[in-house]
Amino acid sequence: MKAGIHPEYVAITAKCSCGNVINTFSTMGKDLNLDVCSACHPFYTGKQKEVSSGGRVDKFNKRFGGLTAKK
């Protein structure tokens, strides 16, 4: 590697809107302000809502589930 062409790798702090502070390293060189981090994101906290969009079978049963075939 050539000397003097690579950016400096410095310590920065990433501050979340929930108050969590994460110390990390970056070549950007300035502190970050985050909207969401692993301490407040619903996926990581377990407060995630699972949405079932349903498939073709569910759609069919919703439309024709109560009907019976005549012989």
Curated annotation (Swiss-Prot):
Signal peptide: none annotated. PROSITE patterns: RIBOSOMAL_L31. Coiled coil: none annotated. Zn(2+) binds at residues 16, 18, 37, 40. InterPro entries: Ribosomal_bL28/bL31-like_sf, Ribosomal_bL31, Ribosomal_bL31_A, Ribosomal_bL31_sf. It holds the Pfam family Ribosomal_L31. GO terms for molecular function: metal ion binding; rRNA binding; structural constituent of ribosome. Keywords: Metal-binding, Ribonucleoprotein, Ribosomal protein, RNA-binding, rRNA-binding, Zinc. GO terms for cellular component: ribonucleoprotein complex; ribosome. It comes from the Bacteria. Its cofactor is Zn(2+). One of its GO terms (biological process) is translation. Disulfide bonds: none annotated. Binds 1 zinc ion per subunit. The keyword Zinc applies. Part of the 50S ribosomal subunit. Belongs to the bacterial ribosomal protein bL31 family. Type A subfamily. Binds the 23S rRNA. This is Large ribosomal subunit protein bL31. It comes from Aeromonas salmonicida (strain A449).
